[in-house]
A protein has these predicted regions:
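N-terminal lobe/hinge region of extracytoplasmic solute-binding protein
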Residues: 58-128
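Gly/Pro-rich hinge or "lid" segments in bacterial periplasmic/extracellular proteins
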Residues: 89-95, 290-332, 338-341, 345-350, ...
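Extracellular/periplasmic solute-recognition and catalytic clefts
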Residues: 406-419, 432-500, 531, 535
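Extracytoplasmic/peripheral linker and loop segments enriched in polar/acidic and small residues
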Residues: 210, 214-224, 233-280, 290, ...
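C-terminal motif of bacterial Sec signal peptides marking the signal peptidase cleavage site
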Residues: 21-24
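Append "and occasionally in soluble cytosolic enzymes with long acidic Gly/Pro-rich linkers
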Residues: 406, 414-416, 508-641, 732, ...
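Aromatic- and charge-enriched surface segment that lines or borders ligand/interaction sites
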Residues: 119-305, 444, 506-516
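Detector for C-terminal structural segments
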Residues: 78-79, 346, 350-351, 355, ...
């Protein structure tokens, strides 16, 4: 069960989640901030009645890294974004607000909302292809300890995240900011340099031969432990009759024989072809290293728990920075233009980069050393390569957000309203972020343990909610429920390299073959998804989350259901058809595609002959753990039965996650079902660009779409700043994806926020919640009764 880029993707997701959380700063229900600083005056009149209001929010176990730079879990991030301020705001669609200081109005779902932020951004695309992000910060931001914030606090934070020793989730260091790569790479960790140089390196400029020899000996010793950990994990988790049979053994035989355990571990992890008689854990590690040629990537991707380097007894000897050339004291493209302004100069335009411009406003005087900050002399609040002082404040956070971090004790984070917050002191005095189990969230709100939660949505959860309300509805006298579309969606994919005619994935015949399958599969979506999810999900028609600003809408010209025309472009369905008639019509339309692919049919409507080079059989992999419990399982089985009536065999293989994942990552799955979480920007590069197909790049284009026109549109879309233009470009790109017949959008499920109707003033929860505009988006106006 390869981890396969999961850690890299998780880091990107965490970073983006933090950006969007920091961007959620206010809306039209919040009046524009006054021009005067919100810091309290020296003399104030005591309120007539002390505000003692408290709200308890249910959350999962914290990683206890409450630092804007080093948080590691989404639950820590929820806390961090409550006391931290970000430079830019975002709207309900996840788009960046350019004019947050004065306020910017954006329509959503028929309502105009005005958004305020801590700063503005002006994007200037230069004639030479470079781009300037001119950032302006409000001049009245105050940290919760009373210290005014300036642009130097922002610059300090940028240099923390660009430091060669930085190991948090931000990827600012990867942006094409002028001089960034030179600054970041001017010092590198010795173990990374040794790993990159390889075993046969003969250049000993930065280390001696003895160091290199000792390093690789230590790697081999750790590698054997690394492989053994995988073996032990596989045996502990998958030694069942079903999986043991994959190596023609029984669970008892595997449990009793270490050699069989190695074979089983290699096979289940996708290394069955590398196994030889008598193979050991050391041989297994050698196979892993050979497969990657990069021990760092191998460690990140193949881990069963521990990093390779965690298992090196002498890793500390190599976990140190080494100067790789002349010192680079600053980043040329980070330009201070005033006490409250900054320009970021990038060598090229990337539409996704603007999300990184909502830099943390991090108090230099708290996380850094003011005596070590002098912008003009290339001093940025700490010694380059040493973030120990910043990390030391991980459990003592400070910021300029709506709340002040007070403590973490016994699984509870206590936060108090920040009177200096730029949108005004929050109405709820105290918020407790309380650890708990997801299954206990809704019952806990009913009993008074919690006031608000975001539980995983399931039939059991919805039943618990409706049972608690006297009206039997999701919102009633006990609980108030808000359903929001999930950021990702479920889909069915086809590997074009494996499902084609005569080895030509891009031919019209190959596209027709795949569209024949998709036409039959698509028609069963409404019935099956409604049966499986009910109100918890809806069928979608395009390969993009409905939450994206680039998603086609039903009112758009040319909008149509996925795979709803035949091979001649004629509509398959009409409004008078019932479900059975639609199924029959879809099957007949599929035949037109199969005929275009080269199939012939006899008088009884069954396949008479298949085209040369067509696969002999077809298979869909579904990770239902052998229990048929997957939202797309019913679609696949219904389509399989329908196709069987015309003589085409489509097998539905319900497998464990490891088998499914190995097939997907090894690009051996003809067809598969999956779901993913999308980002705020609809950039398609990672999933659909040919540079990531055929095992190249990130190996994330599992469809193996290799289309120059699609590649050009993807690049065009990510290099334009015009949102409407990008939307039209992505609409064309989605058309090509659908024409290749490699993806069937299936469903978009929903998330939910549940609050106590009794204790929370639910009228103060945000209106028109979205994945990018949740319950915390207007936390300063959220009130309890």
């Amino acid at each position: 069960m390869k981890m396969s880029n999961i850690k890299k993707i998780l880091a990107l997701v965490l970073a983006l989640v933090m950006v969007l959380a920091l961007c959620a700063c206010g809306n039209s229900s919040t009046p524009a901030p006054s021009e005067e600083t919100q810091a309290p005056a020296e003399e104030t009149q005591a309120p007539a009645e002390e505000n003692t209001s408290t709200l308890v929010y249910a959350t999962a176990t914290f990683g206890q890294k409450f630092s804007p730079f080093f948080y590691t879990t989404a639950y820590d991030e929820e806390v961090v974004s409550s006391f931290t301020g970000g430079l830019l705001a975002a709207d309900r669609g996840g788009a960046i607000i350019h004019h947050g200081i004065e306020g910017e109005t954006v329509e959503y779902n028929g309502t105009d909302y005005t958004y305020y932020g801590m700063g503005d951004v002006e994007v200037v695309q230069n004639d030479d292809g470079s781009v300037d992000y001119n950032l302006t910060m409000r001049d009245d931001i105050v940290f919760s300890d009373g210290t005014p914030a300036t642009i130097d606090d922002v610059i300090f934070g940028i240099y923390v995240m660009a430091d060669p020793s930085y190991d948090g989730s931000s990827t600012v260091y990867a942006l094409p900011i002028e001089g960034m790569a030179d600054y970041y790479n001017s010092q590198q960790y010795l173990y990374k340099l040794l790993a990159e140089a390889g075993r046969d390196n003969t250049d000993f400029t930065l280390w001696d031969e003895a160091t290199q020899t000792a390093f690789w000996a230590s790697v081999d010793a750790a590698g054997e432990k690394f492989a053994q950990e995988i073996i032990d994990s596989v045996v502990a988790s998958y030694n069942t009759d079903e999986y043991a049979a994959t190596i023609e053994a029984t669970p008892d035989e595997i449990a009793a024989d270490p050699a069989l355990q190695v074979k089983f571990g290699m096979n289940m992890w996708g290394y069955g072809d590398a196994w030889t008689e008598g193979a050991t854990a050391a041989d297994y590690w050698a196979a892993i290293e050979a497969a990657y040629g990069d021990i760092i990537e191998a460690s990140d991707t193949e881990t069963a728990g521990s990093s390779l380097f965690d298992l090196m007894d002498d890793f500390a000897d190599y976990d140190k920075l080494v100067a790789t050339g002349d010192d680079v004291p600053s980043i040329k493209g980070i330009i201070r233009t005033g006490d409250y302004s900054l320009t970021v100069h990038m060598t090229e335009y990337d539409a996704t980069a603007i999300y990184n411009m909502s830099f943390i406003i991090a108090p230099l005087h708290h996380y850094g050393d003011v005596s070590k900050y002098d912008y003009d002399n290339n001093k940025f609040g700490f010694d380059k390569g040493d973030l120990s002082g910043v990390k030391a404040k991980t459990t003592e956070p400070l910021g300029c957000g709506p709340y002040i971090f007070k403590s973490y004790e016994n699984g509870v984070v206590t936060m108090e309203a920040n009177p200096t917050y730029f949108l005004g002191e929050p109405k709820t005095k105290t918020i407790l972020f309380k650890e708990g189990e997801d299954a206990d969230y809704v019952p806990g709100i009913v009993t008074g343990t919690y006031d608000l939660a975001v539980p995983s949505i399931s039939e059991e959860t919805l039943n618990a909610i409706t049972d608690a309300n006297s009206n039997g509805e999701l919102t009633g006298d006990t609980l108030t429920t808000i359903l929001v579309d999930y950021r990702g969606y479920g889909y069915l994919g086809i590997n074009a390299d494996l499902v084609n005619i005569d080895g030509d994935p891009g031919s019209e015949e190959s596209k027709a073959l795949r569209k024949g399958f998709m036409t039959v599969l698509a028609v069963y979506r409404d019935t099956v998804i409604n049966s499986y999810y009910g109100d918890r999900a809806a069928v979608i028609q395009y390969p993009i989350s409905n939450t994206s600003w680039a998603a086609p809408q039903p009112a758009d010209e040319g909008y149509r259901a996925a795979y709803s025309v035949d091979a001649d472009g004629n509509d398959i369905f009409d409004s008078s058809m019932n479900d059975e008639q639609k199924y029959d019509a879809a099957l007949k339309a599929a035949v037109t595609f199969f005929e275009k692919a080269g199939y012939t049919f006899d008088a009884d409507g069954k396949v008479a002959s298949a085209p040369a080079g067509a696969p002999e059989s077809y298979e869909i992999l579904i990770p239902g753990q052998g229990k048929q419990d997957h939202p797309t399982y019913g679609i696949a089985t219904a389509a399989s039965k329908a196709l069987e009536t015309i003589g085409i065999k489509l097998s539905v293989n319900d497998v464990g996650t490891s088998v499914w994942n190995n097939a997907l990552e090894g690009n051996t799955a003809q067809m598969w079902v999956a779901a993913w979480q999308s980002t705020a920007d609809p950039d398609m590069y990672q999933v659909y660009h040919s540079s990531n197909a055929h095992g190249k790049g990130t190996n994330s284009n599992h469809y193996q779409v290799d289309d120059p026109a699609l590649d050009a549109l993807i690049i065009d879309g990510r290099t334009s700043a015009d949102t409407e233009y990008r939307k039209s470009v992505y609409k064309q790109a989605m058309g090509i994806i659908m024409d290749w017949g490699v993806e069937l959008p299936v469903y978009q499920r929903k998330d939910c926020t549940v609050a106590s109707t009794i204790r929370v003033d639910c009228d103060t929860l945000p209106k028109d919640m979205t994945p990018y505009w949740g319950w915390k988006a207007e936390i300063e106006t959220l009130a309890v009764k």
